[in-house]
A protein has these predicted regions:
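C-terminal cap of metal-dependent C-N hydrolases
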Residues: 437-494
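Metal-coordinating catalytic core of metallo-dependent amide/deamination hydrolases
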Residues: 71-72, 203-327
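His/Asp/Glu-enriched, well-ordered alpha-helical/loop segment
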Residues: 307-309, 357-447, 463-465
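N-terminal secretory signal peptides
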Residues: 1-34
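Acidic, glycine-enriched loop/beta-strand segments at the rims
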Residues: 69-74, 88-101, 347-353, 420-460
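Alpha-helical scaffold segments that flank or form the walls of functional sites
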Residues: 149-217, 241-253, 498-506
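Active-site gating loops and adjacent loop-to-helix segments of metal-dependent hydrolytic enzymes
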Residues: 146-175, 229-230, 295-313, 329-337, ...
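Histidine-rich, glycine-flanked metal-binding segment
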Residues: 43, 60-81, 86-132, 252
């Protein structure tokens, strides 16, 4: 929904008050190129500049499934000067700075440094904030976001998932994914890998993609199988082709934010996996695979390398049973890994996450962070970084004793640039670098749980929480400002999600049967 007040200050004027025609990013337009039409266009742009929020977010989407409810309004990409922030850039050249400015125009980071001038830009006062790149999450089953509280004592993740997989309708998928996307944006997660492993039919894929069109978050949509699908039955490549043509064809509704991938079940179903890999290779789609939280579910990287499949576009998740041969195969092929830190601790019943994390980093594997599911982890990358940092210490008397510990910078890289590398987006996002898209998070540094700040990286990893996030930009759009979502009506999203979750529980029955015949009201 639109903000109740203009979240920005007056335009940055600079010192020169000479009348000059400039483009939307404040760059002077040569006089010889300024005709009557250009003057009218510039005047029109100036007239609408204060109206930062106006286009409906629910723009036309090509799929046949029409979800119920409108999520909010789509902010325009503006011209902004983020002023005076303490900076954690994750760019090795720019580094961390005690006080820096960031110019953003038309979705792109233009320049970064102290005391910048940006004619015509609207200033965001970040003098009491830390600026950092948006987080990049690499493994999230978003269709089940509604089920975050379906679990209970004695009825945990797999039991709750098994009881509800067939109880979702397409509308439930829409509300689940939209809830997850907007929650991610609010928590500073500007990119996510939607690992869709319960595609029950074309209408379900369409519902998820409608949510992505409305969600305004950068993403990979990783199309997969139906939960419970027979091991001998491949995923629906005919529908993947339909999705590619319908949603990612000539006029995608995502504004360049979403790309298509697949998730596969791995060599555990070897004939099916080989057939699926042959189809994926024809389509040149990036791949995500669960690689095991215990010996019985292991998918070994060394075997995948021998098959000729491993590479930078092959994302392995969990990987707890991996040995040195697997790690070296990943290093040779630049294959990334996604660690869902809470899930590894809860579901990794064979143990070993602490040691695997240290060994992967020591070997030089690209390690990224993820949530797995909302019923396994909080959607909170600050906590994921903190857990990884706390676990990342060598244990005396074990085979990790001589390995280097995880440091704060590594924890931040796992949550940002490494995630971007894992999704093939390192040239687009993951650091505050001129030329990259403006996925930026501003964290209040004067809150009780953060102040007084010292080392910036320690502050981000150990003290900050989503509650401290003041402002979020995704692709140069302000989606959160003054701690409030301005791109979406969060109340409507929550109410729709609550109604959908109530319907899923009612259909599932058993221990999930709601105590009230009507959904809770918020």
């Amino acid at each position: 929904m639109p903000p109740t007040a203009n979240p920005l200050s007056t335009p940055e004027s600079g010192d020169d008050h000479t009348a000059t025609i400039v483009d939307d990013c404040g760059r002077p337009v040569p006089a010889h190129s300024v005709g009557r039409r250009a003057l009218l266009a510039a005047a029109g742009a100036a007239a609408i500049a204060p109206l930062a929020f106006g286009t409906p977010a629910a723009a036309s989407s090509p799929g046949p499934h029409a979800p119920s409810g409108k999520p909010g309004r789509r902010p325009e990409r503006g011209h902004y000067l983020i002023k005076g922030a303490a900076l954690v850039s994750v760019d090795p050249t720019i580094g961390n700075q005690a006080k820096a400015d960031i110019e953003v125009c038309d979705g792109r980071i233009v320049q970064v440094g102290p005391n910048l001038k940006a004619r015509g830009a609207r200033v965001i006062d970040a003098s009491k904030m830390i600026a950092m790149p948006g987080f990049v999450e690499t493994h999230y089953h978003m269709w089940s976001t509604l089920g975050r509280n379906f679990v209970s004592t004695g009825f945990e993740y797999f039991a709750a998932k098994s009881a509800t997989v067939a109880a979702y309708q397409p509308d439930d998928f829409y509300h689940s994914v939209l809830l997850g996307l907007v929650e991610c944006a609010s928590a500073g997660i500007t990119t996510v890998n939607n690992w869709s492993h319960n595609v029950r039919g074309p209408e379900y894929a369409d519902a998820e993609l409608h949510a992505h069109a409305d969600g305004l978050v950068r993403a990979r949509y990783s199309y997969g199988h139906r939960d419970g699908q027979p091991a001998t039955q491949p995923i629906d490549f005919a529908d993947i082709d339909r999705v590619a043509a319908t949603w990612f064809g000539k006029k995608p509704p995502f504004g360049g934010l979403v790309h298509l991938g697949v998730n596969l079940r791995g060599p555990g179903q070897l004939p099916t996996f080989l057939a699926e890999m042959a189809e994926v290779s024809k389509r040149k789609l990036p791949i995500s695979v669960h690689s095991g939280q215990g010996p019985t579910t292991a998918v070994h990287a060394a075997d995948l390398e021998k098959m000729g499949f491993l590479g930078p576009d092959f994302l392995l998740c969990h990987a707890l049973p991996f040995d040195e041969a697997d790690r070296q195969a990943m290093v040779r092929t630049n294959a990334p890994v996604s660690f869902s830190v809470h899930s590894e601790l809860r579901l990794g019943t064979a143990g070993g996450f602490h040691g695997q994390l240290l060994r992967m980093l020591a070997a030089g594997v690209t390690v990224s962070l993820s949530f797995d599911a909302s019923s396994l982890a909080p959607i909170n990358m600050f906590e994921s970084m903190n857990v990884a940092w706390n676990l990342g210490i060598p244990w005396v008397g074990t085979d990790t004793a001589e390995l280097p510990p995880v440091v704060f910078r590594q924890a931040i890289e796992m949550a940002t640039i490494n995630g971007a590398k894992a999704l093939g987006l390192q040239a687009v996002t993951g650091s505050i670098t001129p030329g990259k898209r403006a996925d930026i998070v501003l964290i209040r540094a004067d809150d009780l749980n953060i102040a007084p700040i010292g080392d910036l990286e320690s502050t981000v990893v150990r003290s900050a929480t989503p509650a401290n996030i003041d402002t979020v930009l995704i692709d140069g759009r302000i989606v959160k400002r003054n701690r409030e979502m301005v791109s979406h009506d969060a109340g409507t999203i929550v109410r729709n999600a609550a109604a959908a979750a109530h319907a899923v529980r009612t259909r599932a029955g058993g221990v999930l049967t709601p105590t009230s015949p009507t959904p809770p009201r918020f």
